[in-house]
Amino acid sequence: MNTSTLTPAVSRWVIFILAIGAGFSVASIYYAQPLLPLMGTDLHLSIEGMGMVPTLTQAGYALGILFLLPLGDRYDRRTLIVVKSIALAGLLLACSLTGQIHSLLLVSLLIGMAATMAQDIVPAAAILAPEGKQGKTVGTVMTGLLLGILLSRTVSGVVGEAFGWRVMYQLAAGSIAILAAVMWLILPRFAVHSNLRYPDLMRSVVHLWRRYPALRRAALAQGFLSIAFSAFWSTLAVMLMEHYQLGSSVAGGYGIAGAAGALAAPLAGGLADKLGAGKVTQLGAALVTVSFALMFLMPALGVHGQLILIAVSAVGFDLGLQSSLVAHQNLVYGLEPQARGRLNALLFTGVFIGMALGSALGSQLYTMAGWPGVIALATVTAAIALAIRLAESARTSASVMQNS
């Protein structure tokens, strides 16, 4: 296949494969979270050392989004996706072979950068979507991506406990290598929307950031939600082991509860069309805030009640976060369609800076204040995101009243 014009039947299959590719690639940056106790035992890491693995992976993802994702507006997306796939497969294999902390941290950073192929896939799906179905198509691919984020913990937790953390990374490397071949075979070549040199392309990213206040607020709000999300998932496995003597497979099992939220991605897109993207971001941020705040009730419950409450909260905050993310994407993509790659880069730079901060702050607060400290961080940052969206709504309403 070498054209960018697809029949509807073929397009559906290609979009399905893209959803799988997005899920598997983004999963690469989350496999470590339920495996941290196993890695720590194997490599003799402190809690702070374990926390640096997801922190650097998320930081690498943020760097890759900011500095590599804009290339999608300059070069053929198929080539970018395949090259990143090959690099990611090699890095995952290298991670499985590492024997000391410094090489593990370096490879974790590079895995994050290569895994940004997931964010090349999302705009590619929008381009390949049939006329009038871009929202639904992006929602489908985002469902794959979000399921990859959440189910990655379940898979890695089970595989890690049964076979060891190194085997999990070897299986991940094999799956990405297969995807690289499939993507090369099925994807068309994509039109290039810019002939800017790389330095000019990056300057245009700065221009877009300055030009659109709505973009800045979207990145900031989603970034604060991401701090909450990452702080929870980065410390959950350690907390379950220390307080309940539960292994990594149980920590991964909570990903199944969170996966229910990922299924809301297409629904959130439709809701944004009816209520407006801004309204959906408010509802999503409110749900995240309430879901984390509920976990302050844990001391009043027995052990089983506490574990159930964690699962219920995970469903709630994942549902809210993913709904807010899809609505923010709809909002940002509409600002300047010819610059989707760069706009996506800016939005997700905010997201994954938040993820990296959440991992780092979560680990530090868990060491200093335990699980209540992590929940306090998550609740406060989610509330800040809600305040940003409510302030945006108030600003818009005031502007409408002045103009009427």
Q: What residue ranges belong to the model's regions?
A:
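Juxtamembrane intracellular "pre-TM" segments in multi-pass secondary transporters
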Residues: 2-8, 187-220
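Conserved MFS/SLC helix-loop-helix module at the cytosolic interface between two early adjacent transmembrane helices
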Residues: 63-101
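Helix-to-loop junctions at the C-terminal end of transmembrane segments
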Residues: 65-76, 264-277, 366
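Helix-loop-helix hairpin linking two adjacent transmembrane segments in secondary transporters
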Residues: 103, 140-187
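Cytoplasmic helix-loop-helix junction between adjacent transmembrane helices
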Residues: 107-145
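Intracellular juxtamembrane helix-capping segments at the cytosolic ends
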Residues: 117-129, 321-336
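C-terminal transmembrane helical hairpin of 12-TM major facilitator-type secondary transporters
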Residues: 279-327
